[in-house]
């Protein structure tokens, strides 16, 4: 059995290598299909350069524009959030009607046409900055248990399976508690967990009794687990055209 699992993972990694060579700078992952399964927790595993993070940004920015939904960009530690100031750098030009900024732990924007601007006491126009999302480290999530996030629709947990295999102590429980803090049992929040690689020995699959072997053996792109609460996508099994949108531009 171990040999069969090893063979399945080896094939998956071979496909990932091919995908990395095929992907161009203008390609990005489209979350439309996996969202159609309506699973609250989604694991998206695919080649580096697939555009998973870019696609997630496009999704949550679109959610704010259309419905004013907010997001949380989650990383494991505060150290992993140190580059949050550049979070909008690769996507800002796609939204010429908006100006973006990161203020503290908040992602913010305002309309460049000043449609909802205000005037100060001197009559000068002041842009109205809106909170689009929050940058939070899971290691510090216990500090926000009393904070309400009623407008958050999506949590994006980037690099859920770290290359160095270093997880937090009690990490799965911490994520479950954080999810409940944000969702407040309203069944409103969805969690997108992205990874460039997968190892079967990880605390998440162990906690939820996820056996990936049949999915690997059958080259199945999407598979539900835990009565549909969780879905795992092995994105590289879908073929280039199945999961990559035409272009950023």
Residue ranges and their predicted role:
Residues 2-249:
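Phosphate/NTP-binding elements of NTP-utilizing enzymes
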